[in-house]
Amino acid sequence: MMSKTGALLLTFMILVLFSMAAADALGERFEDHEQKIREQDAGVGLLSLMGRAVIECSKCDTDCKTQKGCIPVAKTTNNPTYCIC
């Protein structure tokens, strides 16, 4: 039969393993989210480097309709829409 100390130690080790697994899963989700943001930022930066202005959604609604050559581009999670003019 296991002593109280041994049972307590075993319980503690199991809790540590579960918490490490949970922390690892959360870390992977955070890294995936960071990667998506980097990819979106890189896409908008590339459009700016091509010599076109990138306008955020709040200005797109009015400017893209009035200016010729303005087209809406990628929807992102943080910023709904960008336009290229």
From Swiss-Prot:
- Gene Ontology cellular component? extracellular region
Q: Keyword set for this entry?
A: Disulfide bond, Secreted, Signal, Toxin
Q: In which tissues is it expressed?
A: Expressed by the venom duct.
Give the free-text PTM comment from the record. Contains 3 disulfide bonds.
**Signal peptide boundaries:** 1-21
Query: Which residues form the propeptide in this entry?
Result: 22-52
Q: GO terms for molecular function, please? A: toxin activity
Q: What is its main location?
A: secreted
Secreted: present as a keyword of the record?
yes
Spell out the subcellular localization from the entry: Secreted
Q: What is recorded about the protein's domains?
A: The cysteine framework is IX (C-C-C-C-C-C).
Name assigned to this protein: Teretoxin Tan9.6
